[in-house]
């Protein structure tokens, strides 16, 4: 059987088999209509009660409209890029990029790919699978969907669990803050841009997952105040855990960009810093380099 970018590996399902009494393998074999040879790659459409309907549209290397039916009956819509070099023999990194309001599912299939974050990621880590979910909103259900999609990808592909990255822009930043208030241990590093913090800080700080917060000083949607407040609350929570100031500075970074940052990059002084930041931060090598370091 040929190995393709859309192939899930028997190796990647081995842990699931041990935990689920081989039900995932039964689904896999049934889907291909034959026996499974040890170590052979299989074109799995079902895995552990999940059913994937692969998308038919593509955009700059992404399959745009994948739909994953969960055991609970929800459908998770997402775009996925798997590098041509991926064959499952070596674990790859994973990056989950959550878009803002303009990328939610009701905005239309593929609207999430208006942002640059998914497209620049492989410039920093070549051996990385990139997913961009199309969520329903920026609240708790969408945060649960991000966690579930992350966990499914970890089981469906050969992924290095120590190299899983997360970002959220605008409303997506609100969503990932809730994710970090529930399952922060899934992620190595997190980028939170032009947004505010809605998640549980104690859960985040217990896990010590590094977070970078970037926003314009005069962000015209949120303002920079909520990000500043969250930053101070996170630092205070780490101090309460008796971490050193040096260690705290490694775990949380606040980057408030002055107006000069935007004007030096071609935006008018009175341009909206929310939209400008959403564009510029994805192409800022210092910001993106921090995430993927």
What feature does the model see in each segment?
Residues 110, 223-236:
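Short alpha-helix in the alpha/beta-hydrolase fold that links the catalytic acid
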Residues 8-9:
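N-terminal export leaders
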Residues 22-92, 174, 178-182, 242-252:
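A domain-start/cap signature at the N-terminus of enzymes
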Residues 214, 220, 239-293:
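C-terminal catalytic histidine-bearing segment of alpha/beta-hydrolase fold enzymes
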Residues 94, 98-147:
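Active-site machinery of serine-nucleophile hydrolases
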Residues 205-211:
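Short, proline-enriched alpha-helix->beta-strand connector loops that line the catalytic pocket
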Residues 85-90, 138-170:
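Gly/Ser-rich "nucleophile elbow"/oxyanion-hole loop immediately N-terminal to the catalytic nucleophile
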Residues 162-205:
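Primarily recognizes the serine-hydrolase "nucleophile elbow" in alpha/beta-hydrolase
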């Amino acid at each position: 059987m040929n190995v393709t970018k859309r192939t899930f590996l028997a190796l990647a399902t081995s842990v699931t088999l041990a935990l689920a009494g081989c039900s995932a393998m039964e689904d896999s074999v049934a889907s291909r209509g034959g026996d499974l040879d040890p170590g052979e790659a299989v074109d799995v459409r079902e895995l552990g009660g999940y059913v994937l309907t692969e998308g038919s549209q593509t955009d700059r290397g992404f399959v745009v409209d994948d739909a994953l039916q969960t055991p609970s009956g929800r459908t998770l819509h997402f775009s996925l890029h798997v590098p041509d070099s991926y064959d499952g023999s070596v674990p790859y990194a994973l990056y989950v990029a959550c878009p803002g309001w303009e990328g939610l599912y009701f905005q239309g299939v593929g609207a999430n790919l208006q942002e640059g974050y998914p497209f620049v990621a492989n410039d920093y880590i070549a051996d990385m699978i990139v997913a961009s979910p199309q969520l329903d909103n920026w609240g708790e259900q969408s945060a649960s969907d991000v966690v579930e999609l992350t966990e499914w990808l970890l089981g469906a592909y050969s992924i290095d669990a120590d190299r899983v990255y997360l970002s959220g822009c605008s409303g997506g930043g609100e969503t990932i803050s809730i994710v970090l208030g529930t399952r922060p241990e899934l992620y190595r590093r997190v980028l939170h841009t032009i947004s505010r913090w809605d998640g549980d800080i104690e859960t985040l700080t217990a896990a010590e997952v590094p977070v970078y917060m970037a926003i314009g000083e005069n962000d015209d949607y949120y303002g920079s105040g909520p990000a500043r407040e969250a930053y101070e609350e996170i630092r205070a929570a780490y101090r309460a855990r008796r971490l050193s100031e040096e260690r705290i500075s490694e775990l949380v970074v606040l980057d408030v960009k002055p107006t000069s940052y935007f004007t030096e990059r071609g935006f008018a002084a009175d341009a909206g810093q929310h939209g400008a930041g959403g564009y510029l931060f994805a192409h800022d090598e210092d910001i993106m380099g921090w995430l993927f370091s």
